[in-house]
Amino acid sequence: MSAVTSLSESAVPAGSGESALGDLSNPASASRRAKDRTATIAMHSAFVLALVPLVWILWTVISHGYRMLLTSQWWMNSQRGVTVRDFGGGAYHAIIGTLLQAGVTAVISVPIGILTAIYLVEYGRGVAARAVSFMVDVLTGIPSIVAALTVYALWISTFGLSRVGFAVSLALVLLMVPTIVRSTEEMLKLVPNELREASYALGVPKWKTIMRIVLPTAFSGILTGVLLGLARVMGETAPLLILGPYTKSINFDLFSGNMASLPTMINQDRTEFLDAAVQRTWGAALTLILVVMLLNLAGRLIARFGKV
């Protein structure tokens, strides 16, 4: 019995409780806690610093432009017949132009982007896949003005066509496609390979597996990427200023005549230092922010509640 007692006493380190308490109060532990607090404070400070300019911009635009948005005239009328000195008029023509250009951009970009992502994930191997991936990376990093000048050189200088709404959409396509490709590519990679293998085991062809299994599984993530890409291109200004001359009238034809948009409306009225033009500038800016925010919110909600 005494032997067992001596063994148990020897198994328990002397002063183990004191050493545990000592670890909490020794300089090394205190230094770690201090570093942790410092890192936490630094992260919160960085968040606040990033939030301050955003809140300031939103507050400035909202406080100056909300009055215009409270009138039905703003949503139902254009600026036709309204001079820079006149109060009134609306942004209906610019909203229609923005939505039309963005819609055509999406119609062209979504199939190209999704098919490219499918190729890279499901079929792409070797040099060809690496070349396509490299070109997508290049397009991701190009400034919007480069895309606008590229379309200008081909559409206007080479083919002699006019500056119309469709030319704007082509420039926006160059900016939207890489966003869709990368977001869709990541969503397709998240689809478990077990689903593909089970489909192949049942004798389903690869193309039908992609159409019936892979794409429906990743649909919510793909749609989120499309909406976020669309929100990005709707806020671009360089293609609109270079390729889309402004008009105060409503134009539904993307292939003929000038077409207004919210960015070009802002640019048109900002050059005037009259109260009426300044109010319209703030109103158009707030309208554009609301449209982009709604698209971003829709994308976030789909990403949160959808299934991948």
Where are the regions that the model predicts?
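C-terminal transmembrane helix and the adjacent membrane-cytosol boundary/short C-terminal tail
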Residues: 185-189, 200, 224-227, 267-308
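Periplasmic/extracellular loop-to-transmembrane helix junction in inner-membrane transport proteins
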Residues: 22-45, 59-105, 125, 265-279
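Transmembrane alpha-helical segments of polytopic membrane transport and secretion proteins
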Residues: 1-49, 299-308
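Generic hydrophobic transmembrane alpha-helix motif, especially the helices
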Residues: 137-175
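Residue-level signal for discrete positions within transmembrane alpha-helices
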Residues: 44, 94, 98, 134-137, ...
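Interhelical loop and adjacent transmembrane-helix boundary motif
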Residues: 82-83, 240-289
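Membrane-cytosol interface at the C-terminal ends of specific transmembrane alpha-helices
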Residues: 106-110, 114-126, 130, 162-214, ...
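Hydrophobic positions within alpha-helical transmembrane segments of bacterial inner-membrane proteins
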Residues: 52, 98, 102, 106-118, ...
